[in-house]
Amino acid sequence: MAFLKKSLFLVLFLGLVSLSICDEEKRENEDEEEQEDDEQSEEKRGMWGSLLKGVATVVKHVLPHALSSQQS
């Protein structure tokens, strides 16, 4: 009977250890995915900022010429 108890405890312990390792790996994968999503969001924000700056520059140069053409 004692042998069965020890075997059962050993099986349960090994199962808990393996479950713990799997949970840890799952959390690491989720963290990596979140970091990738954050990096992609930052890249998109950077692209939008650059795009808006470019549009603003074009508008600054084109708008005065367009207004002076209309006044003539």
From Swiss-Prot:
Cystines in this chain: none
Compartments (UniProt record): Secreted
UniProt-annotated stretches for the region Disordered: 24-45
Pfam families named among the record's database cross-references: FSAP_sig_propep (PF03032)
Record-level GO BP terms: defense response to bacterium
UniProt KW keywords: Amphibian defense peptide, Antibiotic, Antimicrobial, Cleavage on pair of basic residues, Secreted, Signal
GO annotations of cellular component type: extracellular region
Acidic residues bias locations: 30-41
Signal peptide annotation: 1-22
The keyword Signal appears for this protein: yes
Function summary: Possesses a potent antimicrobial activity against Gram-positive and Gram-negative bacteria. Probably acts by disturbing membrane functions with its amphipathic structure.
Name used for this protein in its record: Dermaseptin AA-3-4
Organism: Agalychnis annae
Organism phylogeny: Eukaryota, Metazoa, Chordata, Craniata, Vertebrata
